[in-house]
From Swiss-Prot:
Known function: The glycine cleavage system catalyzes the degradation of glycine. The P protein binds the alpha-amino group of glycine through its pyridoxal phosphate cofactor; CO(2) is released and the remaining methylamine moiety is then transferred to the lipoamide cofactor of the H protein.
Keyword Nucleus appears in the UniProt entry: no
Reactions the enzyme catalyzes: N(6)-[(R)-lipoyl]-L-lysyl-[glycine-cleavage complex H protein] + glycine + H(+) = N(6)-[(R)-S(8)-aminomethyldihydrolipoyl]-L-lysyl-[glycine-cleavage complex H protein] + CO2
Alphabetized InterPro entries for the sequence: GcvPA, GDC-P_N, GDC_P, PyrdxlP-dep_Trfase, PyrdxlP-dep_Trfase_major, PyrdxlP-dep_Trfase_small
PANTHER family named in the record: GLYCINE CLEAVAGE SYSTEM P-PROTEIN, GLYCINE DEHYDROGENASE (DECARBOXYLATING)
Keyword annotations of the record: Oxidoreductase
GO molecular function ontology, one term from the record: glycine dehydrogenase (decarboxylating) activity
Entry EC number(s): 1.4.4.2
Protein name per its UniProtKB record: Probable glycine dehydrogenase (decarboxylating) subunit 1
Broad enzyme group: oxidoreductase
GO biological process per UniProt: glycine decarboxylation via glycine cleavage system; nucleoside metabolic process
Length: 449
């Protein structure tokens, strides 16, 4: 046991204080044969920083990264351009923490950006109120289902076949331990499902993703009316938040709760997180909304100020009264989202969405001309589903050998599910060039030849 700042006298004083003769006495319950009493034979010497950097850089060079090769990956995580000013602002010492302001009124800057974040989210989703962010879209969806059960006092959730399977698994895990019924529909690559017959008097909510995992935008108006007629709530899930710059916001189609994955704005792709969840709802439901709500007020002198209006989480109130155990959430990612959205503005956000759609239309038209390839979508935003003449996974692997990230095989998202082996999800964003598209089209032609 070596702790370098301690002298031998310090160690003896500590041992005397706790009443043991030596360090070995602390480990008397550990068999002698299991104790390490000498250096392990055969271990290489440690490396210096330069050597470690060289070793790890060599390992990393074996990877194909979305920024270094033509990439058409999507399925819930998208590569978009993030202005350098976003990261530069995040480096400010006042912001470089995602930790909850336990004395919130002292941190007026933090509360102000959270208020602006909420305003942006409410505007793009077409809703009346939004919270100060969630961990990500998947956990936000699970929280939305729990919120619906509290509001309706029912325990059945219907999940669309177009909902991302990872979101579905998070919802099933969360609701399963509470004894709720989760009616998850089969994957729906052709947008043919009819959810209306599934909505009954026991249904708390229906969860629909738009655009769906397979790229189909959904008109939610009829489904929203059917849900409301049965006393159920409609939860809309958006995994590509840029689509809200072009498509009708779910709130304007009657959705009661809107959950989005906000990674596309301000947050680059990364290996496993963090992301940022957006959560918006109707004002009449605000007291059952999870997380925190930042509000604007005036102080005793009439000056504008910001406060945490609602914090109905178990760290602040009695556990049995809490609507969520959401903790530090994704504050820094929410700030990145806020800065990027402020830089874009409403017109810039819409222009970004139109550019994404135009890129995807161009790519889909070119891929549809490849012999044996079929585009399954009549309409889409920046992602669509291809049906290939052979299983998609080996095709994607062959294209990766050509340094092209062609997309996500649907079979990877639904392992063991029959009938999906030849389907491939392809996404195009503003980062994709004509040369990228040329590489994919020509590469696919060669692999399928």
């Amino acid at each position: 046991m070596r702790y370098l700042p301690l002298t031998e006298a310090d160690r003896q004083a500590m041992l005397a204080r706790i009443g043991v003769p030596d360090v070995d006495a602390l480990f008397r319950d550990v068999p002698q044969a299991a104790r390490l009493t000498a250096p392990i034979d055969g271990l290489p010497l440690h490396m210096g920083e330069l050597e470690v950097d060289r070793l790890l850089s060599g390992m990393a060079a074996k990877n194909l990264t979305a920024g270094s090769v033509p990439s058409f990956l999507g399925a819930g995580a998208y590569r978009h351009h993030v202005p350098a000013s976003v990261d530069q602002m995040l480096l400010r010492g006042e912001f470089l923490t995602s930790y909850t302001p336990y004395q919130p009124e002292v941190a007026q800057g933090t509360l102000q950006y959270l208020f602006e974040f909420q305003t942006q989210v409410a505007e793009i989703t077409g809703m009346e109120v939004a919270n100060a962010s969630m961990y990500d879209g998947a956990t936000g969806t699970a929280e939305a289902v729990l919120m619906a059960t509290r509001l309706t006092r029912r325990s059945k959730a219907v999940l669309s076949g177009g909902l991302h399977p990872h979101y579905r698994e998070v919802v099933a895990t969360t609701c399963g331990v509470l004894g709720m019924e989760v009616a998850a529909q089969a994957p729906d690559p052709t947008d043919a499902e009819d959810l209306l017959p599934l909505v009954d008097d026991a249904t708390a909510c229906v969860v629909v993703q738009t655009p769906s995992l397979f790229g189909h935008p959904r008109d939610l108006s009829e489904l929203a009316a059917a849900c409301h007629a049965k006393g159920a709530l409609l939860i809309a899930v958006v995994t590509e938040v840029v689509s809200l710059g072009l498509l009708t916001p779910p709130g304007r189609m009657g959705a009661d709760i809107v959950v989005c994955e906000g990674q596309s704005i301000g947050n680059p792709l990364n290996f496993g997180g963090p992301h940022v969840g957006l959560f918006a709802t109707r004002e009449k439901f605000v007291r059952q909304m999870p997380g925190r709500l930042c509000g604007q007020t005036a102080d005793a002198e009439g000056k504008r100020g910001f406060v945490l209006t609602l914090s109905t989480r178990e760290q602040h109130i009695r556990r049995e009264k809490a609507t969520s155990n959401i903790c530090t959430n994704s504050g820094l990612c929410a700030l990145a989202f806020t800065i990027h959205m402020a830089l874009l503005g409403g017109e810039g956000f819409a222009r970004l969405a139109r550019l994404n759609h135009a890129k995807a239309v161009t790519l889909a038209d070119r891929l549809a001309a490849v012999p044996g390839v079929e585009v399954l979508n009549g309409a889409f935003f920046n992602e669509f589903t291809l049906r290939l003449p052979r299983p998609a996974a080996p095709v994607v692997e062959a294209l990766a050998q050509r340094r092209i990230l062609a997309g996500v095989p649907v079979s990877r998202l639904y392992p063991g599910e029959a009938g999906l082996e030849t389907l491939l999800l392809v996404a195009a964003t503003e980062t994709n060039t004509e040369a990228d598209m040329d590489a994919l089209v020509h590469g696919l032609q060669e692999v399928l030849r």
